[in-house]
Amino acid sequence: MNVQIFILLLIISWLTPKITSLPPESQVLDRSSFPDDFVFGTAISAFQSEGATSEGGKSPTIWDYFSHTFPERTNMQNADVAVDFYHRYKDDIKLIEELNVDAFRFSISWARLIPSGKVKDGVNKEGVQFYKALIDELIANGIQPSVTLYHWDHPQALEDEYGGFLNPQIIEDFRNFARVCFENFGDKVKMWTTINEPYVISVAGYDTGIKAVGRCSKWVNSRCQAGDSAIEPYIVSHHLLLSHAAAVQEFRNCNKTLQDGKIGIVISPWWLEPYDSTSSADKEAVERGLPLELEWHLNPVIYGDYPETMKKHVGNRLPAFTPEQSKMLINSSDFIGVNYYSIHFTAHLPHIDHTRPRFRTDHHFEKKLINRSNHETGPGDDRGKIHSHPEGLRRVLNYIKDKYNNPIVYVKENGIDHYDDGTKSRETILKDTFRISYHQDHLKQVHKAIIEDGCDVRGYYVWSLFDNFEWEHGYNSRFGMYYVDFKNNLQRYPKDSVNWFKKFLSRPVVRSEETEDEKVCNVSRKEEKINKALDVSEGFKTSVDSIVNLIKNGSRIEEEDDEEERDFCAFKNHNDQLGFFLKLQNSLGF
């Protein structure tokens, strides 16, 4: 027994440096590190990818109008063709399948389904058929469709008729659009998103005017033809929230949707840190800013009202919900979708021009990419506009958990861009090691949020499947895992991140049967395996044959059954070695 103890201690002393030298968590995470039902996916949106803007009965959207009427505001580019997903979706689905993802998130073009925006004017059968074919093709390839109803592209006809989301009429039109979607696709789609990023729609479209519909106060942005940055962002968000609630009502009342189907809203928070970490004023600015990033659109869909800090700072410019509207909003999201990219530093604004109120200054702070110590929010330089700050995602997830009693959360977008002004070679852009690092680091934070913090996170979607039309940046901002050659027939090329994700998401091959030869595992083969495993240590002076013979002839060790022998013979790495020797320890009675 003393000899056996000595041998065991010798083995453990040899294994200890091997165990402590294992790679860090970010390098060893893979699909199996996450819960079994965790969903991995990728995403696109209709306007950014489909193209075929005048085909199949589709009418112009607000982005068609914006990019054609004000081309200087979209980098002199438009999405008339985009990446031609409308015609190439079958080939693109093969690319999705090769990634080993579980789900694919896409949006339905309201203008393709109901060209006038109003159901009374008719539903476009070609549009219905396109999305049915897309959904069927995804399912046939083992990919779950995840559908977004509104990704910023309502029909221009509604803008011309009554001002789009500035007018409450749009709530019923959106309700009807949603019902058409549920009736036609609800029997095959389990996961639905109502509104994608209401914050961006409201602020970029109506406070800064940099995105469609391009409205703002003239003194904010001289390119804006009309608008009021003091009130329109709040009005638009109000109607977006009520449109969300109306769609959820239709979803829950529709007998054609799957019983286990889920519907929710998707927000786009940037985590905030103080510009000056020693300044109490900047810390208080963060406390005012986070409710805008997170609570502005979550409080209503969970509690039925806006956060108190917004009521305090915006006053009567913030619309109020009626009791009936509040009731409709409460618990109207089965899950919370989070699109996360990075963080901002937040500085207190001590002086505000009260004669020129606007959303960006109502809460007395401004956002910055560099803090007082001249540190950026994360790695980025001239590579692109997104800086990597993965810890912010974990903080966002914990904020939601703590504030809203740990609801179900899906990370619906996470990604990083590569700026391309046309001078970079394809080969340069294909080597996107920064993107691999970005996703490794963010997945590590998601994993920590689940395992260490107890956040109920159920999925992670990469933005985006391929390079596409990136709104005001045109085609210069490349977020895709697949490179699209916009100069040569839109050919797709996998970036290095594609191969990384394939490996990360690969599943072990399960073999249903073993041959008789594979079941036979004799003593000599055991000795060979152990010899290979242990001989990697030059300092291991003890004869492996002696250890094996001692173990083999030990009075207290019984012959293992076939399954245990297969396990014994199969170990190939240090983790397997450790498992074997722990078995040995138990068998010796220690």
Swiss-Prot record:
Entry-linked Pfam families: Glyco_hydro_1
UniProt record similarity statement: Belongs to the glycosyl hydrolase 1 family.
Active site positions: 197 (proton donor), 413 (nucleophile)
Glycosylation-annotated residues: 255, 331, 371, 522, 553
Keyword match Hydrolase: yes
GO biological process, alphabetically ordered: carbohydrate metabolic process
Signal sequence, renumbered to the chain: 1-21
Cystine connections: 216-224
Gene: BGLU29
Enzyme class (EC, first level): hydrolase
EC number in record: 3.2.1.21
Listed GO MF terms: beta-glucosidase activity
Organism per entry: Arabidopsis thaliana
Name of protein: Beta-glucosidase 29
Catalytic activity line of the entry: Hydrolysis of terminal, non-reducing beta-D-glucosyl residues with release of beta-D-glucose
The entry's keywords: Disulfide bond, Glycoprotein, Glycosidase, Hydrolase, Signal
Residue positions binding a beta-D-glucoside: 48, 151, 196-197, 341, 413, 463, 470-471, 479
